[in-house]
Amino acid sequence: MAFTPFPPRQPTASARLPLTLMTLDDWALATITGADSEKYMQGQVTADVSQMTEDQHLLAAHCDAKGKMWSNLRLFRDGDGFAWIERRSVRESQLTELKKYAVFSKVTIAPDDERVLLGVAGFQARAALANIFSELPSKEKQVVKEGATTLLWFEHPAERFLIVTDEATANMLTDKLRGEAELNNSQQWLALNIEAGFPVIDAANSGQFIPQATNLQALGGISFKKGCYTGQEMVARAKFRGANKRALWLLAGSASRLPEAGEDLELKMGENWRRTGTVLAAVKLEDGQVVVQVVMNNDMEPDSIFRVRDDANTLRIEPLPYSLEE
């Protein structure tokens, strides 16, 4: 990517975030084009892509035959096919898996590093972008296209926008917003995704979890009515036989170091600590608070106390902006 990422600043929680423009360099774009694009994706991901309109984007999972996610994809219609955004650390391996059956279909699957991914969030984000684009996405119309730019709308944890665009528009946006917006890198967008309860699948956790272990069913990312796709049997079994015992949780508190993706935490049991869970992502905010996204048993007591392994500080469960009740 020729567009230079902005220098990092300590991320801020959504409630206190000033207007911020972010480079999303830890995320990456990929596309599928060709006559069989829709049919092909329909057989590969958990969402019903045949029902997707131009106005929608959604978080779908791409699974292996056992229903474990290679990655999750923020998917939207793009040209005559689809584009998706995923963590850069998993894109290459995810595309390798996705291409395995492509020889029999009229599709081209490729990474896209020509376009730039930007995020806009914080105080009066909509007003700032309304001065630049003629139409902005909203709850009713979550994807808007204008020229070389696609804008995606997100409701949680507070209204924000993901912009997929060319380098010239990215430079123009930066010039126009530089005076009024703080500039930051991917860590700020990551902090917002953790707060929103959107699962973050990096390379360390690829191939480890079924979609429901990361709350994808609560985010509208799994269709239980569509035809078959890779891993469907296991994903369906988890729902209809109650085989899934895990969920995605948000923890916040303090820690002397940030746990890494794939690491476990410790749960307080009386006077002792027991290892539990798998960390998906963690960020330290500018107020010193540490937020951690972790997959654990779905029956955790709400007042449970956790810590990073052998740490003196503790973490507690925070509410997510959606319900897991089915």
From Swiss-Prot:
Pfam families for the chain: GCV_T, YgfZ_barrel
UniProt entry keywords in alphabetical sequence: Cytoplasm, Folate-binding, tRNA processing
Compartmental location: Cytoplasm
Name listed for the protein in its UniProt record: tRNA-modifying protein YgfZ
Alphabetized InterPro entries for the sequence: GCV_T_N, GcvT/YgfZ_C, tRNA-modifying_YgfZ, YgfZ/GcvT, YgfZ/GcvT_CS, YgfZ_barrel
Keyword Nucleus attached: no
GO biological process, one term: RNA modification
SUPFAM superfamilies: Aminomethyltransferase beta-barrel domain, Folate-binding domain
Gene name, Swiss-Prot/TrEMBL: ygfZ
Signal peptide as annotated in the record: none
Residues noted as binding folate in the record, renumbered to the chain: 27, 189
Function: Folate-binding protein involved in regulating the level of ATP-DnaA and in the modification of some tRNAs. It is probably a key factor in regulatory networks that act via tRNA modification, such as initiation of chromosomal replication.
